[in-house]
Amino acid sequence: ADEGADELRAYMLAVEHLNGEGDGGMLSTFSSKTLEGNGILGKKVEYVTGDTQTKSDAARASAKSMIEKDGAVMITGGSSSGVAIAVQGLCQEAGVIFMAGLTHSNDTTGKDKKANGFRHFFNGYMSAAALAPVLQARYGSDRNAYHLTADYTWGWTQEESIAAATEAMGWNTVNKVRTPLKATDFSSYIAPVLNSGADVLVL
């Protein structure tokens, strides 16, 4: 996935910053009061990579290999909330830190939280809390919303959070429909939306 490739490039740049290595001129423009370019606690940061294939089982297998064969003490990355939750569980079992990458689901640090898991990325609840006042200011408090939701942990918590935030400001939720995760043709979902009386479609 493109998101995974972007994450990898960011991690590689971060390692170069931490280790004080040349990074195409970026380091000279970066200033930090805490990074000294000598790794972490004076130890050079090394990394290995794996491929989640955006599948929980493949992600767990890749992370397990990095922990057992490469001696990883921290796992990070993944561009799916389902992957993040699966790998976080493995890291908890192995006593390894998990720093969540792209996971937008509330559940990553909510109902599926682990003591070894951390996130720096915002979640569905935060998105809804920030979005609701903007929607209200721009579109008012008397809208009918129809939700088409990806049927997995991110979609569920995003739907729940946005519905709660918009209903609290007066919007009506007309319907919530979950779509298969691997769906590519959404044409069969359009007619019910158009016939629902909704004036807002939430994806």
Model features per residue range: what roles?
Residues 69-178, 184:
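Extracytoplasmic ligand/sensor domains, especially the bilobed periplasmic-binding protein
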